[in-house]
Swiss-Prot record:
This is Uroporphyrinogen decarboxylase. GO terms for molecular function: uroporphyrinogen decarboxylase activity. The record marks 75 as: Transition state stabilizer. InterPro entries: UROD/MetE-like_sf (IPR038071), Uroporphyrinogen_deCO2ase_HemE (IPR006361), Uroporphyrinogen_deCOase (IPR000257). Homodimer. GO terms for biological process: protoporphyrinogen IX biosynthetic process from glutamate. Substrate binds at residues 25-29, 75, 152, 207, 330.
């Protein structure tokens, strides 16, 4: 039995006593205890692949702040890693793949990994975290979106131009669609396995959807997000596991995403929540969308911006605060002050009381 079900109620647009709050990258390098755990573990991957350490890191922010959810400590690139691309990290450069896929032959060789063998460490982490949370707050599981995973798989790492994947979109769209289809199959299986292991809400991160033109977004990202929303088995009625579709730069697509079949849409700070709520038209809950850079501001500035964000949502939602999960518009940065996170959480709780 969940002691705090605010997140699940808000994602299902049910009444809550205050707006729930959690933060993307709430378990991360801004916390000294995270840095100590990482130093002990040796690397990011050795933390993510050890269920007990992944659990320890997942719980760290909840031991400091009264957050309304835990999010699994993992990485969006676990799926391509399990497909054989071999993930590694370069200090200062981020994730890389030793075996990127750049032609039809390599793409056609890819298969959906087995979730309880190649990705068992993720499912074991979900199980351990659920046990340790002991019903205190819900656990969010997640995956990268098909488009975002394909970006990394083809580029071989992060990119500024996305030249390789965009060239494939123009020159061999059928090959790219084959890759996106395979990755979508894997994402659906991955999220279903996390749900079976105990995840109580699920989020898809379409981090790079915003680099596409509207026509390309509607061809190479949105249809695959919609397929996930339609095909991912999430249960029925009160037991249904809510699905959040988050994207950077997705504000112009809120109406499309609201029609996808997901329970909620997460937006970044480049659209006002008032505008996003009007576009959503009450069909989905909204999550977001404070600019993470606000945490560099003074405590007073943070409180002011939290109030503006809460009010913006209500303004676009007919005066009601229901159906909103407070979050940042993207993940936290390593140089942010943990005390400012405490200010943010306290402000959300105080200012959103019903």
């Amino acid at each position: 039995m969940l002691k705090n079900d605010r997140l699940l109620r808000a994602l299902n647009r049910q009444p809550v006593d205050r707006t729930p709050v959690w933060l993307m990258r709430q378990a991360g390098r801004y916390l000294p205890e995270y840095r100590a755990t990482r130093a002990r573990a040796g690397s990011f991957l050795s933390m993510a692949k050890n269920p007990d350490i992944a659990c320890e890191v997942t719980l760290q922010p909840l031991q400091r702040f009264p957050l309304d959810a835990a999010i699994l400590f993992s990485d969006i690139l676990t799926i391509p890693d399990a497909m054989g691309l071999e993930l590694y990290f370069v200090e200062g450069e981020g994730p890389k793949f030793r075996h990127p896929v750049r032609d039809a032959a390599a793409i056609h060789r890819l298969g959906v990994p087995d979730m309880e063998t190649e990705l068992r460490y993720v499912m074991d982490a979900v199980r351990v975290i659920r046990r340790e949370l002991d019903g205190s707050v819900p656990l969010i599981g997640f995956s990268g979106s098909p488009w975002t995973l394909a970006c990394y798989m083809i580029e071989g790492g992060g990119s500024k131009e996305y030249a390789r994947i965009k060239a494939m979109a123009f020159n061999a769209p059928e090959v790219l669609h084959h890759l996106l289809g395979t990755v979508t199959d894997a994402v659906i299986a991955y999220l279903a396995a996390q749900r079976a292991a105990g995840a109580q809400a699920l989020q898809v991160f379409d981090t790079w959807g915003g680099v596409l033109s509207p026509a390309m977004y509607h061809e190479f990202s949105l249809p695959y997000l919609t397929r996930i929303a339609h095909e991912l088995e999430r249960g029925e009625g009160a037991e249904r596991t809510p699905l959040v579709l988050f994207g950077k730069g997705n504000g112009v697509y809120v109406a499309d995403l609201a029609a996808s079949g997901a329970e909620a849409v997460g937006v970044d700070w480049t659209i006002s929540l008032a505008d996003a709520a009007q576009r959503a038209g009450g069909r989905v809950a909204l999550q977001g969308n404070l600019d993470p850079a606000t945490l560099y501001g003074s405590p007073e500035a943070i409180r002011t911006e939290v109030g503006k964000t809460l009010d913006s949502y209500a303004q676009g939602n007919g005066g009601s605060r229901e159906g909103h999960v407070f979050n940042l518009g993207h993940g936290m940065s390593p140089d942010m002050n943990p005390e400012h996170v405490g200010v943010l959480v306290e402000a959300v709780q105080r200012l959103s009381k019903r």
